[in-house]
């Protein structure tokens, strides 16, 4: 893993060490309580913005679970070549002011899980999500955290470890149902998308595909609804979103994948030839 020194940055303070505390599944998932074993990066590469550490008065109405995740989770900051340059809170990484002013770019992943009938599992994000509440999106979308197991670049192992963790956290899918070695990383994309006036996304997103029959028990703090769709059903969902029927909305990252890659890759899902289209060398800059 190559670290770049941000020569324009202020002197940064190494983060305090915290155990991982995710949403309500934390209470029922003992292994999620294991603290990170990662030693902090040097102070000059650790990005912490004290000015917004505690948020502001406008955040007072934020859901307690989402607020905790916003301040406890440390995202991995990268440059446009996906080289790690530091880390910062989930809160700061999703503030459009900081995204625009400091060009904060963080690493993310998007899981596309298909069952044995080659139907794609979609989720509707919960109403309490800070960014893009109640939009429909792919199976799971989140961030590798700044911890040893999720910083591993080789074979995208860090992103795959994070995907397994969040599939349990968001959808209650047991780790044994989604072995890390069953994820196929197909590509990376870089995009920016505002959610509202305050929040947004600026991500370098790992696109992970997996074909498994799984048990699902959605976490209501994260997920409002789920559904499996075949190709025709997804096309109908796209039509409704484009027409604005029933207020249906899709996440911008999901739409980018649909418009640029998904249906071509779906052919390879059905043929069992996903590795033939994998391209982890290219970073697709999409708008």
Curated annotation (Swiss-Prot):
Active site: 141, 203
Expression (tissue specificity): Mainly expressed in roots and trichomes and, to a lower extent, in leaves, flowers and stems.
Pfam families cross-referenced by the UniProt entry: NUDIX
SUPFAM superfamilies: Nudix
InterPro entries xrefs: IsopentenylPP_isomerase_typ1, NUDIX_hydrolase-like_dom_sf, NUDIX_hydrolase_dom
Cofactors named for this entry: Mg(2+)
E.C. numbers: 5.3.3.2
EC top class named in words: isomerase
Stretch forming the transit peptide: 1-51
Source organism of this protein record: Cannabis sativa
GO MF annotations, alphabetized: isopentenyl-diphosphate delta-isomerase activity; metal ion binding
Cofactor binding annotation: Binds 1 Mg(2+) ion per subunit.
UniProt keyword Transferase present: no
Domain Nudix hydrolase positions: 104-256
This protein's name: Isopentenyl-diphosphate Delta-isomerase 1, chloroplastic
Binding site for Mg(2+): 94, 106, 201, 203
Catalytic activity: isopentenyl diphosphate = dimethylallyl diphosphate
Motif Nudix box boundaries: 142-172
Gene from which this protein is expressed: IDI
Homology family: Belongs to the IPP isomerase type 1 family.
């Amino acid at each position: 893993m190559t670290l770049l020194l941000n020569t324009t940055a202020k002197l940064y303070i190494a983060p305090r060490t915290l155990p991982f505390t995710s949403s309500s599944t934390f209470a029922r998932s003992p292994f999620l309580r294991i603290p990170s074993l990662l030693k902090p990066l040097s102070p000059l590469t650790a990005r912490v913005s004290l000015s917004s550490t505690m948020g502001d008065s406008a955040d007072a109405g934020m859901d307690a679970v989402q607020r905790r995740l916003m301040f406890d989770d440390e995202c991995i900051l990268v440059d446009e070549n996906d080289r790690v340059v530091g880390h910062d809170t989930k809160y700061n990484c999703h503030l459009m002011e900081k995204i625009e002013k400091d060009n904060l770019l963080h690493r993310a992943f998007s899981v596309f899980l298909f069952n044995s009938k080659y139907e794609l599992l979609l989720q509707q994000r919960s109403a309490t999500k800070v960014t893009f509440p109640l939009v429909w999106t792919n199976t799971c979308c989140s961030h590798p955290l700044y911890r040893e197991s999720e910083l591993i670049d080789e074979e995208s192992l860090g992103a795959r470890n994070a995907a397994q963790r969040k599939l349990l956290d968001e959808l209650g899918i047991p780790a044994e149902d989604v072995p890390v070695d069953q994820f196929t990383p197909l590509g990376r994309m870089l995009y920016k998308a505002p959610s509202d006036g305050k929040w947004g996304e600026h991500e370098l997103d790992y696109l992970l595909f997996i074909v498994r029959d799984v048990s699902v028990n959605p976490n209501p703090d994260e997920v409002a609804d789920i559904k499996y769709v075949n190709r025709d059903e997804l096309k109908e969902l796209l039509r409704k979103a484009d027409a604005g029927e029933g207020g249906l909305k899709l996440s911008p990252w999901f739409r980018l994948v649909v418009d640029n890659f998904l249906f071509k890759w779906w052919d390879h899902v059905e043929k069992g030839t996903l590795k033939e289209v994998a391209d982890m060398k290219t970073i697709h800059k999409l708008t």
